[in-house]
Amino acid sequence: VEYFPTTEPHDEGYLDVGGGHKVFWTASGSPLGVPALILHGGPGTGSSPGQRGMWDPQRYRIIQMDQRNCGRSTPSAADPAVRLTDNTTQHLVSDIEQLREHLGVDRWVLWGGSWGSTLALVYAQQHPERVRAMVLVFMMLARRGDLRWLYQEMGRYFPAEWERFRAGAGEENEDDLLSAYNNLLNETTDESVRRAAASNWCAWEDVISSLDPGWRPGPFYGDPDFVLQFSRITTHYFSNDAFLEPNQVLNEAHRLMDIPGVIIHGRDDRANPYDMAWLLARAWPTAEFRTLPGVGHTPASPSVRDAILEATTRYADLP
């Protein structure tokens, strides 16, 4: 099964969400189709046109938004003078609701990958009546231990690369690399220090999934503006526990029981270990849980593609 051809947007714009922030959005596919919202990962990557291919453009109204301070949303975190104090998970949930109202959507299908799955779940738990169905890939609970795994403990798989990552934060910060990098990226006034930290951060991000079959280096890590935007936003969120209460996503899972959903997760996902998806499936038993043997944390896997297309095809027929 192949993805659908990527269609160009038939509508786009900037939504003023307050506080000087404007969120960029696009709509493609059928203007009269089932509304579907794609929530990108990161946080801080921005939207990818290729993700539209997961949806039948004849049946879906495919909506994308660049989360605050990234992609084409303004102001951009690529500008070091831009402060990120008004960029939290709750701000993003509010932005999604404002976009839904702006576009005249009653209920929509949500797709989220990795961090996007976290955001989709938090939004759905607060606004379950606005969610028609959910497709979650590479599930992330974003608990403190999950984040420590990514940036501390995962160094056991990549000791040489992690040594370089750790050294970039300074020897005295070995036990809290998230806070150290957040300070280097969001508090320092030295541009050369900030750029070096951004480069080191993205080098580690690129390593995380490098054992997966079909892995390719991140295509945007050669863009200094993307590198700074992404690393600043990611460290801002993850050094603050993603602005979530402890175990929030699992504790609020009971609010999802009336929402159809599918959790698609690679059994060999090292970035977001399998237990995260398993725990969510246990807390949300009405969702379908698709375990993909031999699959890691890469969307290039044919079994990931097939599982996504099966779900989006089925959800196009929901009332």
Identify the residue ranges that each predicted region occupies.
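N-terminal cap/lid segment of alpha/beta-hydrolase-fold proteins
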Residues: 2-23, 234
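Conserved HGGG/HGGXW glycine-rich cap/lid loop of the alpha/beta-hydrolase fold
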Residues: 17-75
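Conserved acidic catalytic loop of the alpha/beta-hydrolase fold
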Residues: 90-108
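Conserved hydrolase catalytic core segment
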Residues: 106-145
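A catalytic-pocket lid/entrance helix-loop region that shapes and gates access to the active site
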Residues: 129-183
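Conserved alpha/beta-hydrolase "acid-adjacent" motif
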Residues: 245, 270-276
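Short beta-strand/loop motif that positions the catalytic acidic residue
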Residues: 256-257, 263-265
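Catalytic active-site module of serine/aspartate enzymes centered on a nucleophile-bearing elbow/loop
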Residues: 287-319
